[in-house]
């Protein structure tokens, strides 16, 4: 009998009523093969599937669970808020408190607008940048993903990479023509775009750490160079911190790498596990947003009281002294241990990591710093490694193009168990 018989049954059932059996493509395990695990519950650093098996979790709901699963402060905040009502469609005090906390923690954000997802945040920020500058074109980077808005699904990164589709059908060429795709970590490609369209580019949008082609940090000159080019040509710099915000550092990767954006997009951790996104930045730019300005954006559930309570509780905990030091130390321990184990078993491996993010690349290269480097990695070897680790009770992202995430709920014993499991798996590759 299969070890995952209930997951297999549920997956077959789901495929009859949900496209592909999942509500987000990467969950289908298309990137690694096999049947996706159906999860019954989660606690701390662990997931528990419907067949009763426990896994050390390095997906963390794709980033939000920086405190670990089912954190009592967040759980209690949600229960308390739910007792007062689920949605009002009107302003609340918690929205104000949440906005004040976000702008306090991320100093480049003078003002912030709450939305319901990272996609909404990036889509709205780009509309705002276009409206503020009165320009149409945007620059994004090959292999970077900023949600599934039409103008951004151009050489988009993980979602598309996992499925082997660099572009999505259904995106008209007329939409995509205003999206200029440059090479991550290559300032020359950005200079060329600005030289070709010096007065037409509204903004650059960038993941400060590219977490949707696994985990690729910026080269030292890259983010400052983008800031300088935006200043030179009158474009806005949008830093997409949906993944890195409150994880790489308390004030995000922009703080870690010392770069000042005009607009910042947030998601994942900001909701503590609830569906929350946000975008914000310079006061004069945000003033162009409705109802004070002409750029329209709205949402029935934006600022939802349950989501705001969860987010406020999460950010309050994340901002405690020592959280990010612990997160970094645990990630460093995992990265060093995996590299050592791989070396012992003669497996060529590169591990990129920053803050509470990490990426594993099966490659003979000495480093991975670009989309081209990522595409040279051994995806088939990753697939085998993923399933071997799953059998060992370790849940990694089911795609060679997705970052891994640490939480402060992971213990050093969890990390050591993971390293020991990886050593056994490396020996079988």
Swiss-Prot record:
It comes from the Bacteria. The modification N6-(pyridoxal phosphate)lysine is found at residue 268. Keywords: Cytoplasm, Isomerase, Porphyrin biosynthesis, Pyridoxal phosphate. InterPro entries: 4pyrrol_synth_GluAld_NH2Trfase, Aminotrans_3, Aminotrans_3_PPA_site, PyrdxlP-dep_Trfase, PyrdxlP-dep_Trfase_major, PyrdxlP-dep_Trfase_small. Its EC number is 5.4.3.8. Its cofactor is pyridoxal 5'-phosphate. Belongs to the class-III pyridoxal-phosphate-dependent aminotransferase family. HemL subfamily. NCBIfam families: hemL, PRK00062.1. This is Glutamate-1-semialdehyde 2,1-aminomutase. It comes from Serratia proteamaculans (strain 568). The gene is hemL.
């Amino acid at each position: 009998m299969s070890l995952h018989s209930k997951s297999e049954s549920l997956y077959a059932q789901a495929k009859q009523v949900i496209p592909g059996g999942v509500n987000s493509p990467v969950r289908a395990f298309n990137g690694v093969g096999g049947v996706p695990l159906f999860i019954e519950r989660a606690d701390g650093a662990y997931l528990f599937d419907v067949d009763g098996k426990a896994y050390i979790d390095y997906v963390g709901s794709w980033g939000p669970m920086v405190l670990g699963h089912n954190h009592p402060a967040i759980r209690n905040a949600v229960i308390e808020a739910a007792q007062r009502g689920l949605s009002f469609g009107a302003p609340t005090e918690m929205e104000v408190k949440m906005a004040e906390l976000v702008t306090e923690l991320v100093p480049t954000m003078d003002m912030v607008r709450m939305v319901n997802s990272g996609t909404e945040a990036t889509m709205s920020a780009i509309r705002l940048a276009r409206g503020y500058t009165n320009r149409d074109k945007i620059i994004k980077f090959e292999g970077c993903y900023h949600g599934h808005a039409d103008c951004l699904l151009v050489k988009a990164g993980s979602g598309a990479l996992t499925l082997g589709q660099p572009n999505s059908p259904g995106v008209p060429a007329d939409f995509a023509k205003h999206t200029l795709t440059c090479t991550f970590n290559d300032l020359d490609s950005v200079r060329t775009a600005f030289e070709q369209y010096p007065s037409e580019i509204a903004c650059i949008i960038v993941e400060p750490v590219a977490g949707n082609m696994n985990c690729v940090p910026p080269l030292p000159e890259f983010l400052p160079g983008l800031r300088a080019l935006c200043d030179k040509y009158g474009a806005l710099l949008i830093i997409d911190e949906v993944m890195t915000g409150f994880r790489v550092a308390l004030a995000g990767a922009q703080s870690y790498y010392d770069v000042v954006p005009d607009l910042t997009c947030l998601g994942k951790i900001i909701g503590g596990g609830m569906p929350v996104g946000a975008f914000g930045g310079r006061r004069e730019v945000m003033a162009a947003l409705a109802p004070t300005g002409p750029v329209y954006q709205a949402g029935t559930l934006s600022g939802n009281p349950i989501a705001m309570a969860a987010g406020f509780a999460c950010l309050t905990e994340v901002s405690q002294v020592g959280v990010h030091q612990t997160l970094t130390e645990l990630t460093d321990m995992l990265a060093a241990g995996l590299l050592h184990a791989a070396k012992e078993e003669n497996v060529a491996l590169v591990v990129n990591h920053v803050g509470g993010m990490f990426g594993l690349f099966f490659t003979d290269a000495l480093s991975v710093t670009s989309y081209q480097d990522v595409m040279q990695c051994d995806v088939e070897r990753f697939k085998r490694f993923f399933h071997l680790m799953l059998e060992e009770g370790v849940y990694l992202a089911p795609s060679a193009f997705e970052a891994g995430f640490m939480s402060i709920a992971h213990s050093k014993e969890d990390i050591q168990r993971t390293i020991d499991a990886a050593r056994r798996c490396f020996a079988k590759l």
